[in-house]
Swiss-Prot record:
Record-given protein name: Sucrose synthase
Tissue expression pattern: Expressed most predominantly in tap root.
Function: Sucrose-cleaving enzyme that provides UDP-glucose and fructose for various metabolic pathways.
Record-stated family: Belongs to the glycosyltransferase 1 family. Plant sucrose synthase subfamily.
Region ranges (GT-B glycosyltransferase): 220-698
Keywords: Glycosyltransferase, Transferase
Length: 766
């Protein structure tokens, strides 16, 4: 007993508690130890001799490859290592600092300026070269040195302080121009003075907050390009189509909010500039009744934002049909070249900021940024590597259907090329104490027989920033605010959708007792979203079935309607579950709904019925539907794997559920029992969710933050251009020598109908 106690309290037990994986190749056991998020160590235990040795990353991955190849004798394997290029980049060391990159960077920059006044010179140079379409802004040639800048600022301060605060810039423009200042400081005397005070403070005693405020207010971003390549990118009748879901909603809401913020800032900067936002996506000639075959489409609710569509083409010509996001790789280089010409033509010059979305959009953003020398921001939405366990080491098993060697290589290049990366949650970057983050999983991995990644991405890199989005408040608002709208006129349509007994391609299943509250879920119908898992949990729980009905909005209910292999498998599974658990009378399956206004009212209608929203995904990077439901006041039960675990405070603003443990459906049962006993309990959880959204998840906060990040990282890109050049040369070499061949190995799609065998191909894990 004493020996066991010593073992359980000793260092080896700490190793076991922190172990993420173990590889057994007798007589050795190699263990990957993760004492805290972002920090990894590797050890190997000889079980026969009971000794322990520390391994390098390369040695551990070499040992791991033996699981696939047997005894690995190849000592000359291509290894990717980005660490040497990042030695000059400052980074935090505490796990709690991950995702707050801009704060750390501001501390570093202000500290450098404070300790060494020579570090102020890049700021002066940056302000002096600042132009938009050839027009000089901020400083002109009268100011050549820091001393001259300080003197001019003091002189301008003395002049401006005597003017009324609301004096328009035009009335004193020529006076301060003679001192060395151009447009961009502000639209009134008060705002110009405020900006000049910020710069004087930086020159005298720089601090992080002042530096961030100043850089964030600089007029730097007028033209933005947003890449979203795969799926059907449109504004109507697209949601629920293959590869078309939350990312589209995210970007359209982002663009509306971003344009509003840009217009406000440009006005306050005293500039007469028209901003432009281009969403660049794929043009699909066979558009299935959507607008995806139109080259240009104005974004509704905006003045200066458009969707620019560019087709996929090869030597065979333009590809007419949709193809899966897993099959786009051979088209992306040509797509990038074509898009570059279209972008420059539309904007009459280069953009100021390029934002990539998902793996394909991020690699295209990297190629465009590399070509144009523009600040690049990445948004992953979801990294597939964490969705499919062991998809790196057993990559060959996945390659024919998923081409993960291309996708993970593209992800790796894009995240190292980006100037800054936005995530919606901490977990997306570095996971939790017990789970590995999406980005963190790219720190070290191996493709046996292809290459090893010994240092892919460092989650402590200050390029990572958590900026959470919100829901469109014009569509998603609390159920208690219905008196401000006439949307209740939609209730007849909603009631038909939920309760009409007719069985057709839009809805199947009936609800016998329409007075019962509804468990509601809405998502794409694929394996990871796990809608069928929710249906199975419900089917197994007799008490829950007695207390509430289940309604899901997901995909098609007819396999003939879908060309997506995962969706087809899930459709077939759903039909099996309906029969197996005899769900008739308690379950309604509604096909995907693309009318967002009606969807918003649907959430509120479920509120009126005393229902809940369930989000059962195996993993959810963020959870936009969770935010939408909570914004409407609907109590929400969502996966504990990924973003929803941060959005929801368990038991306060909603509930966490673990989709890997079906018995957690009991949480929903307990909720409905409590609501029967205490009608105020539903209201309490609803109010908790609304408060959480108001505090953390709004598009206004998102856009303000994004514009500030663009300013700070634009300056950092200018300051650190020499260090970044080496990284980009390394990436360029990897792209040309390795990635191109991987992309070209993916078969080109055809416009012929897929065979039945291809259509029903499903995911098979190792």
């Amino acid at each position: 007993a004493g020996g066991k106690q010593i073992l359980s309290d000793g260092p080896f037990s700490e190793v076991l508690r922190s172990a993420q994986e173990a590889i057994v190749v007798p007589p050795f056991v190699a263990i990957a130890v993760r004492p805290r998020p972002g920090v990894w160590e590797y050890v190997r235990v000889n079980v026969s001799e009971l000794n322990v040795e520390q391994l390098t990353v390369s040695e551990y991955l070499h040992f791991k490859e033996e699981l696939v190849d047997g005894k690995a004798d190849d000592h000359y394997v291509l290894e990717l290592d980005f660490e040497p290029f990042n030695e000059s980049v400052p980074r935090p060391t505490r796990s709690s600092s991950i995702g707050n990159g801009v704060q750390f960077l501001n501390r570093h920059l202000s500290s450098s300026m404070f300790c060494n006044k020579d570090c102020l010179e890049p700021l002066l140079d940056f302000l002096r070269v600042h132009k938009h379409k050839g027009v000089v802004m901020m400083l002109n040639d009268r100011i050549q040195t820091i001393q001259r800048l300080q003197s001019a600022l003091s002189k301008a301060e003395d002049y401006l302080i005597k003017l009324p605060a609301d004096t328009p810039y035009s009335e004193f423009e020529f006076v301060i121009q003679g001192m060395g200042f151009e447009r961009g400081w502000g639209d009134t005397a008060e705002r110009v003075l405020e900006m000049m005070h910020l710069l004087l403070d930086i020159l005298q005693a720089p601090d992080p907050s002042t530096l961030e405020t100043f850089l964030g207010r600089l007029p730097m971003v007028f033209n933005v390009v947003i890449l979203s390549v795969h799926g059907y990118f449109g504004q109507a009748h697209v949601l629920g189509l293959p590869d078309t879901g939350g990312q589209i909603v995210y970007i359209l809401d982002q663009v509306r909010s971003l344009e509003h913020e840009m217009l406000q800032r440009i006005k306050k900067q005293g500039l007469d500039v028209t901003p432009r936002i281009l969403i660049v996506s794929r043009l699909i000639p066979d558009a299935k009744g959507t607008t995806c075959n139109q080259r240009m489409e104005k974004v509704s609710g905006t003045e200066h934002a458009s969707i620019l569509r560019v087709p996929f083409r090869s030597e065979k010509g333009i590809l007419r049909k949709w193809i899966s996001r897993f099959d786009v790789w051979p088209y992306l280089e040509t797509f990038t070249e074509d898009a570059a010409g279209e972008i420059i033509g539309e904007l009459q010059g280069r953009p100021d900021l390029i934002i990539g979305n998902y793996s394909d959009g991020n690699i295209v953003a990297s190629l465009l940024s590399h070509k144009m020398g523009v600040t690049q921001c990445n948004i992953a939405h979801a990294l597939e590597k964490t969705k499919y366990p062991d998809s790196d080491i057993y990559w060959k098993r996945f390659e024919d259907k998923y081409h993960f060697s291309c996708q993970f290589s593209a992800d790796l290049m894009a995240m190292n090329h980006a100037d800054f990366i936005i995530t919606s949650t901490y977990q997306e970057i570095a996971g939790t104490k017990n789970t590995v983050g999406q980005y963190e999983s790219h720190k070290a991995f191996t493709f046996p027989g292809l290459y090893r990644v010994v240092h892919g991405i460092d989650v402590f890199d200050p390029k990572f920033n958590i900026v959470s989005p919100g829901a469109d408040m014009a569509i998603y608002f609390p159920f208690s605010e219905k008196d401000v709208t006439c949307l209740t006129s939609l209730h007849r349509l909603i009631e038909q959708l939920l309760f009409k007994p007719e069985q057709n391609e839009e809805h199947i299943g009936v609800l016998d007792d329409t007075s019962k509250p509804i468990i509601f879920s809405m998502a794409r119908l694929d394996r990871v979203k796990n809608i069928t898992g929710l249906v199975e949990c419900y089917g197994k729980n007799a008490k829950l079935r007695e207390l509430a009905n289940l309604v899901v909005v997901a995909g098609y209910n007819d396999v003939k309607k879908s060309n997506d292999r995962e969706e087809i498998a899930e459709i077939e599974k759903m039909h099996r579950l309906i029969q197996e658990y005899n769900l008739r009378g308690q379950f309604r399956w509604i096909a995907s709904q693309t009318n967002r206004v009606r969807n918003g009212e649907l959430y509120r209608y479920i509120c009126d019925k005393g229902g809940i929203f369930a989000q059962p995904a195996f993993y959810e990077a963020f959870g936009l539907t969770v935010v939408e439901a909570m914004t409407c006041g609907l109590p929400t039960f969502a996966t504990c794997h990924g973003g929803p675990a941060e959005i929801i405070e368990d038991g306060v603003s909603g509930f966490h559920i673990d989709p890997y443990h079906a018995d957690q459906a009991e949480k929903m049962t307990e909720f409905f029992v409590k609501c029967r006993e205490d009608p105020n309990y539903w209201t309490k959880i609803s109010a908790g969710g609304l408060l959480r959204i108001k505090e953390r998840y709004t598009w206004q906060k998102y856009s303000e933050r994004l514009m500030t990040l663009a300013g700070v990282y634009g300056f950092w890109k200018y300051v650190s251009k020499l260090e970044r050049r080496e990284t980009r040369r390394y990436l360029e070499m990897f792209y040309i020598l390795k990635f191109r061949d991987l992309a070209n190995s993916v078969p080109l799609a055809t416009d012929e109908e897929p065979s039945t065998t291809d259509a029903v191909a499903t995911f098979r894990g190792p």
